[in-house]
Regions:
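Sec/Tat-exported extracytoplasmic proteins
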Residues: 37, 41, 91-95, 138-146
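Short acidic low-complexity segments
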Residues: 43-54
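Short, well-ordered alpha-helical segments
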Residues: 121-146
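Surface-exposed short loop/turn segments
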Residues: 56-102, 108-124, 136
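A structural "domain/chain start" motif
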Residues: 2-42, 146-149
């Protein structure tokens, strides 16, 4: 779709087919982040001292998913679950810190006691979506920084 020289971008190439150094612990969230970055054709290195002169270093400072349940009525049965996702990251090159940012997102799940397996599957999908949105946030800030320069 385009009009007057403006067009919508399908996706960003900021984190596509690059050599990336990712500094983080080995939590499930960080391992999923690595998996999604690899799926975009990136080579992921986990050591700081890797020869990556022009490459990007991603330092995950904080990566967390919190789950909360909401209940209403006299029986106080859980009717809804809330998932809060937070990733705090620093993007840098060997020479300088480019970006420090915290990305947060919240999603809600309807709770159905009779279909817990379905809810678990839906939660796994939401986690993948949270991480994908976190990567898009990184790409957005990298593109913004490139446009400033």
């Amino acid at each position: 779709m385009s009009s007057c020289g403006y067009s919508l971008r399908e996706s960003s190439s900021e984190l596509l087919q690059q050599d990336l150094v990712l500094i983080s612990d080995n939590s499930d969230l960080n391992l999923e982040l690595i998996s999604q970055l690899k799926a975009k054709g990136n080579k992921i290195f986990r050591a700081k001292n890797i020869e990556n002169e022009n490459g990007l270093i991603i330092r995950i400072k904080f990566h967390e998913l919190n789950k909360f349940s909401g209940a209403i009525g006299a029986g106080a049965r859980t009717t809804q679950a809330r998932l809060d996702y937070v990733i705090s990251y620093e993007l840098s090159s060997k020479r300088e810190i480019i970006i420090e940012h915290i990305y947060e997102s919240t999603k809600y799940l309807s709770f159905n006691q009779s279909d817990l397996l379905s809810m678990e599957r839906e939660e796994k999908i939401l986690v993948k979506n949270f991480i994908n949105d976190g990567i898009k946030n990184m790409e957005f800030h990298l593109a913004l920084k490139d446009n400033e320069n």
